[in-house]
Amino acid sequence: MKFQLDPKIKELTKKYVAPPNAKDSFIKDIKATFESDRYSLDDDERLLHSHGQHSTDEVYKVLYNRLDSFTDLVFYVETHDEVCLLIELAKKHDVCLIPYGGGTNVTNALKPPRDEKRMVVTVDTRRMNQIEEIDKENLMVTVQSGITGKDLEGALNKEGFTVGHEPDSHEFSTVGGWISTNAAGMKKHRYGNIEDIVQNVTMVTPNGIVNQKQALTRSSIGIKAQNVMFGSEGNLGIITRATLKIHEKPEISSYESIIFK
């Protein structure tokens, strides 16, 4: 079998990004409330935050100028309080917010709707990446929602612990993303899925702050209010904090690989 290494269609180095649908009153309040490094109207930043990793179709559209919708502004939150302030301003000015973690979403949840008439702001949570507490006695860790799996696991390993949650996107995806997509991991048979690991979640919504206790186990008995944040895909609010179960790191780790010739 021979492969064509020289594609007929060349990648476009200069990607087209539609002009932002910026709402002047919202921008004015943003500038008056936050530091200038919290927000960006830059075309490259907007392009980066206007898609996830849904399929090869989405990759093709990014490479060859086929994206048909773009976020209008990217906002980088750093604290829970900043999320609260941003949501209040969005309510005041009727602005649409799209939460963004590691950018690995595969359900088109990061793509701005084509028919959305309001200004769209993508809220990047990756600066909210701190571990607030490692409770070694009760085997729990409390983190901000923007920490990646790689950084969380690395910090816990140094203390002799592990979360044990490893989705394929582990290196880039965030704890908030795990919860909002109801993620499963490669070690789920040992440590469980994300709803088995999470002990508490804090979400900021347009109507206030929700603190959700441990989710219920999986079953088919109708809608369960305790599980409403899991798999919500950013539709209900922005997750800012979570408490997860941790486990002692195994004393021995062994790895095997199979090579096909």
Annotate each predicted stretch with a short phrase.
Residues 1-88, 106-139:
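N-terminal flexible segment immediately upstream of the FAD-binding catalytic core
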Residues 32-33, 92, 158:
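Residues at alpha-helix termini
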Residues 89-92, 232:
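Alpha-helix C-terminal capping segments
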Residues 94-96, 162:
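Residue-level detector of anion-binding/catalytic polar loops
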Residues 100:
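Conserved PLP cofactor-binding pocket of PLP-dependent enzymes
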Residues 129-261:
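FAD-binding subdomain of flavoenzyme oxidoreductases
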